[in-house]
Structure formats: structure tokens, C-alpha cells
């Protein structure tokens, strides 16, 4: 029986009501900042319940050069590895040449399951923006055991040399497994 349909065995956190306007992301213990360098595509896994979202966002702490753009989206999870697979939605770009929360508007209903939130430094003009990143996060997937460390660390992957203009239809093979090192831009969603 699915975990979310049997309240007697469902963790209290999973029973909380998701309300329109609430934000949803990976549970984070501490943060750091880091540059969003041109051509880098980062992604981290997150389990979503059956839910609709209307925003995907990030937090810029130091503005990039005028005209710099970040692109956000969501990838489906691979069914054979702890890795992103096909693109579910390319939410488009936001200006990262100003500080603060930067959001794209989407209309997406997700079935319960794992998805990968993604950020591409789409266009960097003169100087890269600095983004809020996870340093230490709570691994919501324990005690999953795998030869791949992604679900064990709760971190994510980074692919280099990704062209601007759109998110790749399939997440690039051979991305760097960041393990528990942090350095993944915090991407969040808003519940519709």
C-alpha cells in the first residue's frame, strides 16, 4: 500500500497539508553561496506527493552582469539509476542580474514520485551571479542503498558545457556526482 494512503504508518511530516502559496524544496540544514558559471547545469532529486506547482525559483545573493539569465526546469527521474533522465518542463529564464528570489511561472501537476529540480546558467554577461546553495541537507531518501551515492547524500549532479537557449531534452550523461559536498543551487517550487 502506498505510504501516503495509510495514515497509521505515514510520518507526521508527510501528513502535513500542502497549501496553495507554500514553497516546497529539499530540507536543508545549512547553506553556502557559489557562482552560477556559464554552461553549468545542476540538478538535485526531490520526492513530490501528488501536487500542482505554479512557480520554480532560486535565490540570487550577488547579482550577475546586466543581461545574465538563469533557466530553471524539472527532469524526470531515471528508472534505472539515481540520475535525472528526460526533461519534464523547461520553465524558461529569469534575470539573475538583480538579487533576491527569482521565479518562473509554470502550470504543472506532478504525480507522486521522484523528480530532479534543475538550474542552468543560461547566459552570463561579464560576471556570474552568486546563488544560495545547499551545504548540508537532510537526506529524505534514507535508507536507500545504491552503488550511486546521490540518494545517500541527498545532493545532486553538475554537468558542464551545456549550451544556452533551452534545457537539454535528456540530462547530459557523465555529470559530476557532487555527493555530500554541497554546491547545488537551491531550487524551490511553489504549490498552486
Model-derived features with residue positions:
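Short, intrinsically disordered N-terminal pre-domain segments
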Residues: 1-15, 190-192
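A short beta-turn/strand-edge loop motif at beta-sheet boundaries
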Residues: 7, 63-67, 176-179
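Short amphipathic
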Residues: 22, 42-47, 90
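Extracellular beta-rich ligand/substrate-recognition surface
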Residues: 27-39, 93-98, 178
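Extended extracellular/luminal ectodomain segments enriched in beta-structured repeat modules
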Residues: 36-39, 47-55
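A short beta-strand element within beta-rich, extracytoplasmic domains
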Residues: 51-62, 117
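Aromatic- and Gly/Pro-enriched, solvent-exposed loop/edge beta-strand patches characteristic
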Residues: 67-147
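Short, surface-exposed beta-strand/loop patches at domain edges
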Residues: 121-192
